[in-house]
Swiss-Prot record:
Protein topology in the membrane: Single-pass membrane protein
Required cofactor names: Na(+)
Self-association and partners: Heterotrimer of an alpha, a beta and a gamma subunit.
Biological processes, Gene Ontology terms: sodium ion export across plasma membrane
Catalytic activity: oxaloacetate + 2 Na(+)(in) + H(+) = pyruvate + 2 Na(+)(out) + CO2
Cell compartment(s), UniProt: Cell membrane
Protein name: Oxaloacetate decarboxylase gamma chain
Gene behind the chain: oadG
Principal place of residence: membrane
Protein role: Catalyzes the decarboxylation of oxaloacetate coupled to Na(+) translocation.
Keyword Transmembrane helix in annotation: yes
Length: 85
């Protein structure tokens, strides 16, 4: 075989391989879309129920007054541990 024949054969194999890969990818895309539609049809997402009471975005000031001694005690405990290490 001459170089020209080998080159032509290589081009033919390359085009055939690229065509096969393109065909396979197109089939794969359609299969995934069909499976996605089937899953969404037979297993729909459950609807989210809203919470009974909205969660307040800000802690009421009365709660901060109750937490202040706890925070002070935690800071003091942490500082004592840091000094002992």
């Amino acid at each position: 075989m001459t170089n020209a024949e080998l080159f032509g054969e290589g081009i033919n194999l390359m085009i055939a391989g690229m065509g096969f890969v393109m065909f396979f990818l197109i089939i794969l895309i359609y299969a995934i879309s069909v499976i996605s539609r089937l899953i969404n049809k037979y297993f729909p997402d459950p609807t989210q129920t809203p919470p009974a009471q909205p969660i307040p975005a800000v802690i009421p000031p009365t709660d901060l007054e109750r937490l202040r001694p706890v925070i002070v005690a935690a800071i003091a405990h942490h500082r004592r541990q840091q000094r002992s290490n």
